[in-house]
Amino acid sequence: MNVTVSHIRSALQECYPPREAANLSRIVCCEMLGHSHIDYYLGKDMILSPKDEKELESILFRLCNFEPIQYVQGTARFLGRTFRVAPGVLIPRPETEELVERMLEEVAPASRILDIGTGSGCIAVTLSKELPEAEV
C-alpha cells in the first residue's frame, strides 16, 4: 500500500497541534518505518507491506490516544544513549539528564554510587560508562 507523509501528518493533526504532529510524523516515518529523511522531506510516498500497514495503524492509534512516543517506539534517549522503555518504566527526563551531568562534574571518579528504583537504568548505565573507575 502507498502511504503519503501528508496522510500520516494529517492523521496526527487530528490529535496534536501542527508542529507536534509534524515532529511525530517524522519520527514515525523515518525512525519507526524506515523512510529516509530525504524522501520524508521531499514528501515521497512510502510503500508499506501489509505488516507495516498494520504497524502504522497501531502506531497512529496509540499516539492519538496520547501514549508517549517513547513507549510507542520502545526507546528513549538519555545523554546520547538509547534505553528501552515500556509503560511500566518511567521515561527519562531532561531534568534527570541535568542531575547526572552535575554528578559527573562533582563526583570523584572512583566513587561508590547507588541507584535505587533504577527503572530504565539510564542513570546507573550512564554513570558507569562515564565514570569507569566508580562502583555503580
Go through each PLM region and give its residues.
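Non-catalytic accessory regions of SAM-dependent methyltransferases
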Residues: 1-35, 39-41, 45-48
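Conserved SAM/SAH cofactor-binding pocket of Class I
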Residues: 95-136
